[in-house]
Amino acid sequence: MRTKYCGNIRISHVNKKVKLCGWVHKVRNLGQFIFVDMRDYTGLVQVIFELKNYKIFKKALNLRNEFCIQVFGTVQKREKKNQNIKIRTGEIEILANVLNILNTSKSLPLNFTQENNDDSRLKYRYLDLRSFDILENLKIRNKITYLIRNFMTKKNFLDIETPILTKSTPEGARDYLVPSRNHYGKFYALPQSPQLFKQILMISGIDRYYQIVKCFRDEDLRSDRQPEFTQIDIEVSFMSAKKIRNLVENLIKKLWLEIRNINLKKFPQISFHEAMKKYGSDKPDLRNPIEIIDVSNIFKDKKFISFFNLNPQKNNRIALLCISKGAHLSRKKIDDYTKYVQRFDAKKLFYMKIKECKLGCLGIHSSIKNILDEIILKEIIEKSQSKNGDILFLIADQEHIVNKSLGMLRLKIGIDLNITKKNRWEPLWIVNFPMFDKDIQGNLSSVHHPFTAVKNMDREILKNSPDLAISDSYDLIINGYEIGGGSVRIHDVNMQKQVFDIIGIKKSMQNEKFGFLIEALKYGAPPHAGIALGLDRIVMLLTNSKNIRDVIAFPKTTSATCLMTNSPSTVDNLLLQELAIKHLKK
């Protein structure tokens, strides 16, 4: 039906006859001529219909946006004054001699010349996908997956598929469940990750595994999450955490070089503890140079504990942010920031405007001026390295509240004052996470998942002080986004049982949910490690997209619905009866 694609015709094709298929992007009727911008997935080309060729001209009068058409014509060079340097085909045009209208189109519910609301875009996704921005994102995504497969194949990894219908296991988020018709009252689960299967593959002797795989989590959504998502899943035997990180680092560097022509520097590495202390987050955006500065030792006197209304029985922290040249901030803006940190349970936000350092207390304007003396002020200025014209924001509270509040305020101020550097890439590894979290009842749960090995395979700390155990795990962060996470896995059956015991999984539940893994670990399981990288997030970053939906062909809304197909939906009662399922009203 066609000999060329619209976006691929160039000046070298002048006087050549072409056959094109595509859609009407825009129509302009100038009386003697009708100009049509014709579009396919490669781009646009201008087609001319002349009045003197009346038969085809008359047909062209019926054209409307998004009609699907076929055009035969001759490539000709545009006059210099009519050339369009904004498009790749701007030097040429097609003089049409045949027009076939393959299909008409209703008036569009979307306007490609302006922004459309998200619900309309998702409801008419088949039209939204015709836009060049979304189409370009999908092309880039295709190139990224090609590069990944090529890289992994060259590193001798095998692409192996794992089951989609699997067993429900406690992995953190809720499972999507699939009822079994053949086994009444029993359910499959859609995998949150291929975690257990890829470990089984290592036990099977598959030395190097990878897979670009769909995963499913029934969790609350946000701009960088979807209920079904794609991850680059990697597992390898006999490889240290350091070498896994090096492998992934080289893969990420290759993607950034090939897609963005950017040479990423060596990825820095910091511990979880350091990240929380300096940035208030285990996903720090290093494009923002502001760091949290601890001043607890400066305010250790009892009068300060009283002033800040701190409970001495709690794990407290006093810390601040130093904002360079921020003393110009208005009282209203400071009040706005106070309200902002209160969203994260901070009781109050204190501030100090440094007008003139040399004047001591006389040279500052502060909400804590009445408890400061020259010695304390000097220590604060030295610790924060603040200068004239700076502003300090201080919070005194429980450590986790201070970290969260100042961490979020750091990000907000970075954006508000243009401190966070755009068009810059700052990857880093976060390592040495705690092995377990403790809830208010004192119960422990895995920070990552219960198959993560303790650092240095330290059995004694698991036995005597599990709450102090450090895991041999690692997360990859780029510009504040968690791109991936992984760990060295437990390959010793007794240690695996020990971890299950620590997090409160009863023996009967261990056998019911993980019996196949426990049994497999008894047969010479090798040391192994792995990682999972979020493909959707990687594509989102590489395309400069604001939302993960813009890099997925058919995404869900933040309420996990598909507006195009109206799913999830009700099903026929007969189907439910076959599955022995009864609908209960809430």
Curated annotation (Swiss-Prot):
One of its GO terms (molecular function) is aspartate-tRNA ligase activity. Keywords: Aminoacyl-tRNA synthetase, ATP-binding, Cytoplasm, Ligase, Nucleotide-binding, Protein biosynthesis. SUPFAM superfamilies: Class II aaRS and biotin synthetases, GAD domain-like, Nucleic acid-binding proteins. Its EC number is 6.1.1.12. InterPro entries: Aa-tRNA-synt_II, aa-tRNA-synth_II, aa-tRNA-synth_II/BPL/LPL, Asp-tRNA-ligase_1, Asp-tRNA-ligase_1_N, Asp/Asn-tRNA-synth_IIb, AspRS_core, GAD-like_sf. Residues 195-198 are annotated as: Aspartate. GO terms for cellular component: cytoplasm. Coiled coil: none annotated. It is found in: Cytoplasm. It is an enzyme of class 6 (ligase). NCBIfam families: aspS_bact, PRK00476.1. Catalyzes the attachment of L-aspartate to tRNA(Asp) in a two-step reaction: L-aspartate is first activated by ATP to form Asp-AMP and then transferred to the acceptor end of tRNA(Asp). HAMAP family: Asp_tRNA_synth_type1 (MF_00044). Belongs to the class-II aminoacyl-tRNA synthetase family. Type 1 subfamily. Homodimer. This is Aspartate--tRNA ligase. It comes from Buchnera aphidicola subsp. Acyrthosiphon pisum (strain APS). The gene is aspS.
